[in-house]
């Protein structure tokens, strides 16, 4: 028979009493009233804050967006198919944040910063809020360094600086993504971290962009944030903020970053869907009243940091899709008014074979020549005006039967200038190559060539300069000015190449 020892029992009871935790844990909970279309209505959650994360019984996370008198409207970060009516929901006391680290470079992630490329987990010790306040006036300095896109039309006439926000907009299939991806390819060796945010696109389009980056070695310095067309509206709405948080992480570590939002029209549509399902009152084009704030708080996070903060920068290139070239629609005008300039891609120019299809008349950079090196200012200063005058003259010349010699010469020069701005996709040019190309056109060296020969001649000239006159590239890179020595080298190269080119054409 087992003997019961009173002292052992009393010791056990004493230990249990000492281990007893008198803390009371108060959890803010609620009950699901209804769920569907990515929206849940919750009764309870009395002390929940706007934008707070809530957790459902089966693990789905949501964001409390609508705080009404008798219920809370929550948008779901998932399909929510397992959420049942009457199940419990608890407030987490947190707002959306993501892990950040250098390990994200070269990876493809979703809006929650989870990898979707099948290469395993990403280690991160720090985290950043998805929505963080933009730098203030004192934290910034004016834009003064160029961010080279590698596209002659942009770098010479619509220059972009580090810390600038430049809108790229146009109809579908006009090469908006191509301009953005070419800019990323051109950052190779420039010590710029790139973030490409794909919002609501086809998975095949995103895969194509990622493949291009991998083939050209651009993934080494690029992070791709992707939420495809089949993702919940909540995640499409959050994706740009996730990209901005990652870019900010590098900016505040005194690095230069470039972020591309492709495209903000889809984000606005996702936000409109969420708002209408939450029964918020619709405004113009059925968008909610705060759709301007949706984009302004995102784009204001792009900045050029002050000297005290290490002069890091975050350059934003948002993309917006227009319908039938309507520049005055709601979202395009909103984003135009937020950004420091815009690049308009025209469907008519694209179909006419002018690619990149940049409409120089409507496009503008509000930073201007502050974002150009001195050499580019010296060579390309008048090219935008000349092209604008040519476009006007060309329209007029269609109605005139006989034109004087000066007008004919101006038209011929304009046609050749337009020809030298044409560029193949994924073929960015260095600054020295751009300067040599523009100088050749604006100084009349191409006037004697047929229009069809211009591009072939320029390609050969750039190759000739690289192999026979490497000093030209060195002078531009080191001094950043178009010196007399550089001009002499370039003139000699043009004359030598012109003679060789004419001999080749005669054979």
From Swiss-Prot:
<dbReference type="InterPro" id="IPR033732">
    <property type="entry name" value="ATP_synth_F1_a_nt-bd_dom"/>
</dbReference>
<keyword id="KW-0066">ATP synthesis</keyword>
<protein>
    <recommendedName>
        <fullName>ATP synthase subunit alpha, chloroplastic</fullName>
        <ecNumber>7.1.2.2</ecNumber>
    </recommendedName>
</protein>
<feature type="site" description="Required for activity">
    <location>
        <position position="363"/>
    </location>
</feature>
<dbReference type="InterPro" id="IPR005294">
    <property type="entry name" value="ATP_synth_F1_asu"/>
</dbReference>
<keyword id="KW-0472">Membrane</keyword>
<dbReference type="Pfam" id="PF00306">
    <property type="entry name" value="ATP-synt_ab_C"/>
</dbReference>
<dbReference type="InterPro" id="IPR023366">
    <property type="entry name" value="ATP_synth_asu-like_sf"/>
</dbReference>
<dbReference type="InterPro" id="IPR000194">
    <property type="entry name" value="ATPase_F1/V1/A1_a/bsu_nucl-bd"/>
</dbReference>
<keyword id="KW-0067">ATP-binding</keyword>
<keyword id="KW-0406">Ion transport</keyword>
<dbReference type="GO" id="GO:0046933">
    <property type="term" value="F:proton-transporting ATP synthase activity, rotational mechanism"/>
</dbReference>
<dbReference type="InterPro" id="IPR020003">
    <property type="entry name" value="ATPase_a/bsu_AS"/>
</dbReference>
<keyword id="KW-0139">CF(1)</keyword>
<keyword id="KW-0813">Transport</keyword>
<comment type="function">
    <text>Produces ATP from ADP in the presence of a proton gradient across the membrane. The alpha chain is a regulatory subunit.</text>
</comment>
<dbReference type="Pfam" id="PF00006">
    <property type="entry name" value="ATP-synt_ab"/>
</dbReference>
<dbReference type="InterPro" id="IPR038376">
    <property type="entry name" value="ATP_synth_asu_C_sf"/>
</dbReference>
<keyword id="KW-0934">Plastid</keyword>
<comment type="subunit">
    <text>F-type ATPases have 2 components, CF(1) - the catalytic core - and CF(0) - the membrane proton channel. CF(1) has five subunits: alpha(3), beta(3), gamma(1), delta(1), epsilon(1). CF(0) has four main subunits: a, b, b' and c.</text>
</comment>
<dbReference type="GO" id="GO:0005524">
    <property type="term" value="F:ATP binding"/>
</dbReference>
<dbReference type="InterPro" id="IPR000793">
    <property type="entry name" value="ATP_synth_asu_C"/>
</dbReference>
<comment type="similarity">
    <text>Belongs to the ATPase alpha/beta chains family.</text>
</comment>
<feature type="binding site">
    <location>
        <begin position="170"/>
        <end position="177"/>
    </location>
    <ligand>
        <name>ATP</name>
    </ligand>
</feature>
<keyword id="KW-0793">Thylakoid</keyword>
<keyword id="KW-0547">Nucleotide-binding</keyword>
<keyword id="KW-1278">Translocase</keyword>
<keyword id="KW-0375">Hydrogen ion transport</keyword>
<dbReference type="InterPro" id="IPR036121">
    <property type="entry name" value="ATPase_F1/V1/A1_a/bsu_N_sf"/>
</dbReference>
<dbReference type="InterPro" id="IPR004100">
    <property type="entry name" value="ATPase_F1/V1/A1_a/bsu_N"/>
</dbReference>
<dbReference type="Pfam" id="PF02874">
    <property type="entry name" value="ATP-synt_ab_N"/>
</dbReference>
<keyword id="KW-0150">Chloroplast</keyword>
<dbReference type="GO" id="GO:0009535">
    <property type="term" value="C:chloroplast thylakoid membrane"/>
</dbReference>
<dbReference type="GO" id="GO:0045259">
    <property type="term" value="C:proton-transporting ATP synthase complex"/>
</dbReference>
<dbReference type="GO" id="GO:0043531">
    <property type="term" value="F:ADP binding"/>
</dbReference>
<dbReference type="InterPro" id="IPR027417">
    <property type="entry name" value="P-loop_NTPase"/>
</dbReference>
């Amino acid at each position: 028979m087992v003997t019961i020892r009173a002292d052992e029992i009393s010791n056990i009871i004493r230990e249990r009493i000492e281990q007893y935790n008198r803390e009371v844990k108060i959890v803010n909970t609620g009950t699901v009233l209804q769920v569907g279309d990515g929206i849940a209505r919750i009764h309870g959650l009395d002390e929940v804050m706007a934008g707070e994360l809530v957790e459902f019984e089966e693990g789905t996370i949501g964001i409390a967006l609508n705080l009404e008198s008798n219920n809370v409207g929550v948008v779901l970060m998932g399909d929510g198919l397992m959420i049942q009516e009457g199940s419990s929901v608890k407030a987490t006391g947190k707002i959306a944040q993501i892990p950040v680290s250098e390990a994200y470079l070269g990876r493809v992630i979703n809006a929650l910063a989870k990898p979707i490329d099948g290469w395993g987990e990403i280690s991160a010790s720090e985290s950043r809020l998805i929505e963080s306040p933009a730098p203030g006036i004192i934290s910034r300095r004016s834009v003064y360094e160029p961010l080279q896109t590698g596209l002659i039309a942009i770098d010479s006439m619509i220059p972009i600086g580090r810390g600038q926000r430049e809108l790229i907009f146009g109809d579908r299939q006009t090469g908006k993504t191509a301009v953005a991806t070419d800019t990323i390819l051109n950052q190779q060796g420039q010590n710029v971290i790139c973030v490409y945010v794909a919002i609501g696109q086809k998975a095949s389009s995103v895969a194509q962009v990622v493949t291009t980056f991998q083939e050209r070695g651009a993934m080494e310095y690029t992070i791709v944030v992707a939420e495809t067309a089949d993702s919940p509206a909540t995640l499409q709405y959050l994706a740009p903020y996730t990209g901005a948080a990652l870019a900010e992480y590098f900016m505040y570590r005194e690095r230069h970053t470039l972020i591309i939002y492709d495209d903000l029209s889809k984000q606005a549509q996702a936000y409109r869907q969420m708002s209408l399902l939450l029964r918020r009152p619709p405004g113009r084009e059925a968008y909610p009243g705060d759709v301007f704030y949706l984009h302004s708080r995102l784009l204001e996070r792009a900045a050029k940091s002050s000297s005290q903060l290490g002069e890091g920068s975050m350059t934003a290139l948002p993309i917006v899709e227009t319908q039938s070239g309507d520049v005055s629609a709601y979202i395009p005008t909103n984003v135009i008014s937020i950004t420091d300039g815009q690049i308009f891609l025209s469907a008519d120019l694209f179909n006419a074979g002018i690619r990149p299809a940049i409409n120089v008349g409507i496009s503008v950079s509000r930073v201007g020549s502050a974002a150009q090196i001195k050499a580019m200012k010296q060579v390309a200063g008048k090219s935008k005006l000349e092209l604008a005058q040519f476009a006007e003259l060309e329209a007029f010349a269609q109605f005139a039967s006989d034109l004087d010699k000066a007008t004919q010469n101006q038209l011929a020069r304009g046609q050749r200038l337009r020809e030298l701005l044409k560029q193949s996709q994924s073929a960015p040019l260095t600054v020295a190559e751009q300067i040599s190309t523009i100088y050749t056109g604006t100084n009349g060296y191409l006037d004697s060539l047929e229009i069809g020969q211009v591009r072939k001649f320029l390609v050969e000239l750039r190759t000739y300069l690289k192999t026979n006159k490497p000093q030209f590239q060195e002078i531009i890179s080191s001094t950043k000015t178009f010196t007399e020595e550089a001009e002499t080298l370039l003139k000699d190269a043009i004359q030598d190449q012109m003679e060789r080119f004419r001999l080749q054409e005669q054979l």
